[in-house]
Design a protein with these regions (language model features):
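N-terminal FAD cofactor-binding segment of flavoenzymes
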Residues: 22, 35-99
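C-terminal auxiliary extensions adjacent to catalytic cores
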Residues: 365-450
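Predominantly flavin-linked oxidoreductase catalytic cores and closely associated redox partners
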Residues: 36-38, 132-269, 305
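Active-site-proximal substrate-binding core of FAD-dependent oxidoreductases
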Residues: 290, 323-374
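N-terminal Rossmann-like FAD-binding beta1-loop-alpha1 element of flavoenzymes
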Residues: 3-32
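FAD-binding beta-loop-beta segment adjacent to the flavin cofactor pocket
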Residues: 279-306, 351, 355, 365-371
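A conserved FAD-binding loop/helix module that cradles the flavin
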Residues: 306-325
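Flavin-binding catalytic cores
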Residues: 251-280, 289-291, 298, 330-349
């Protein structure tokens, strides 16, 4: 027999947890379903960056107020309590394969002197954040069901939505799909039929200590050219919120760890490295949905977007969707018109805010240049560029800085000029699709941004 609710939420990550908290506070009879037994335990690799403080992101000017321990979303008009550990970082440095040349996004030396005012952003404990959101949800009457693998979502004859999983059936007037980039809700409800699938990006992440890196409080990314391999590998190093000597260290595959730490030009950074814990991840990449609504199912966060909507973007979606559903039920409009405010907000804040294809620049940038070309290219940047963590902007910031140097590049390394033409918005989608066809996204995949 079905358990009946105003709202059934699938997924207890940032989007689902925020939707549950909001719905509970609004007095909706709500159930949240989660496949993990402990939703606040982070079992998937995640950098846990606050994305982003440096710019408008998804039409929001978000930031963390460390004085009152709140994440602030002033455009959308809400805050989120967070009193767990944090750690600032002050720049993003992209290193060349030789380990010497680098492209600095932000003046690390100057920014670190300014403390909180100079930070590019910060990292925090995602598990602590989820724990607080879900505690508030349950306190306000939300029923949480863990260990539930959803195996069906469909519209009922009476206009509601039925969700099945773990031998149980849950029926809601509305359903929110908050189950990530590989959303089962999106698949079951047919959202993906009109989307383009760009590939799946697996990765391996480590929390490590004992590093000796040039910029200890910065995000560092680098390419490495392993001998006798088809594609270069790469890595991310990001400060960890759990200790000043701890870092998040991510790469495409487990076999890259030994090469990067023992044989690469960066090996001196890792002479005393110690692995504390290890996590894996897989992120599916789809073009965004045309509309995050179908038959009383609303998608939030990663499930509707390309790659990842970040923790922050997912929370914004969850809150907006739950409030829209509340209004729809109060107005006795349990249909699309009732939740039109969420649909319109999502379109304005996500696909209309910026072209998602700008976020695709990371993938070809990592593979399309030879080792010699990459070393040369990154040696051209003599001064720090604009400080940004925004994946929509970073490609454009680099292109704008390169523009005055193209005549020099044409003379000194003409092969680069032709390759740089690929990094244009109208060409990039086909490049990524070609990478999927070639097997690149399986062999040398990308990693989530935050």
């Amino acid at each position: 027999m079905s358990k009946k609710y105003d709202l059934v939420i699938v997924g207890a990550g940032p989007g689902g947890a925020m939707a549950a908290k909001t719905a509970g506070e609004n007095g909706l009879k709500t159930a949240i379903l989660e496949r993990k037994t402990n939703p606040a335990e982070i079992t998937r690799g995640c950098a846990m960056m606050f994305a982003v403080e440096s710019d408008y992101y998804f039409a929001e000017r978000m930031y963390y107020n460390e004085k009152n321990k709140k994440m602030i979303f002033p455009v959308n008009g809400f805050t989120v309590d967070y009193d767990g550990p944090t750690r600032n970082f002050y720049a993003w440095h992209i290193y060349a394969p030789n380990g010497k040349a680098r492209l600095p996004l932000g003046n690390y030396e100057e920014n670190i002197k300014r403390g909180d005012e100079g930070r590019l952003s910060l990292v925090y404990d995602k598990g602590k954040l989820l724990e607080g959101l879900l505690k508030d949800a349950v306190k306000n009457g939300v029923e949480m069901f863990t260990g539930v693998n959803v195996d069906g979502v469909e519209r009922t004859e009476k206009g509601g939505v039925k969700v099945t999983g773990g031998g149980d059936t849950f029926e809601g007037t509305f359903v929110i799909g908050a189950d990530g980039t590989g959303s089962r809700v999106a698949e079951f409800m047919g959202f993906n039929k009109e989307r383009t699938f760009y590939g799946a990006a697996p990765g391996i992440t480590y929390y490590v200590t004992g590093l000796d890196i040039p910029q200890s409080e910065a995000v560092i990314t680098a390419n490495c050219f392993k001998p006798d391999t088809r594609y270069p590998t790469f890595f991310w190093i990001i400060p960890s919120p759990y200790g000043m000597d701890e870092y998040w260290f991510a790469m495409p595959a487990q076999e890259d760890f030994e090469y990067i730490t023992r044989e690469s030009p960066f090996s001196d950074w890792f002479r005393d490295v110690k692995v504390i814990r290890k996590k894996s991840l897989v992120t599916s990449m789809w073009s965004p949905v045309a509309e995050p609504y179908k038959d009383n199912v609303l998608l939030v966060g990663d499930s509707a977007w390309y790659f990842e909507a970040e923790i922050t973007g997912s929370m914004m979606c969850g809150r907006r969707a739950a409030n829209a559903i509340t209004v729809a039920l109060r107005d006795n409009k349990p249909h699309r018109e009732g939740v039109l405010s969420y649909i319109e907000w999502w379109k304005k804040s996500f696909p209309e805010f910026d072209d998602y294809r700008h976020m695709m620049m990371f993938f070809p940038f990592r593979f399309m240049f030879s080792e010699e070309e990459m070393n040369y290219l990154l040696s051209l940047f003599k001064k720090p560029l604009r400080a940004t963590l925004n994946p929509f902007l970073v490609g454009r910031v680099i292109q704008e800085s390169l523009a005055p140097m193209l005549s020099q590049v044409q003379e000194e390394m003409p092969s680069l000029v032709e390759k740089l033409k690929v990094l244009e918005i109208d060409a990039i989608e086909q490049v990524v699709l070609d990478l999927k066809t070639s097997g690149y996204l399986n062999e040398r995949p990308g990693l989530p941004f935050g």
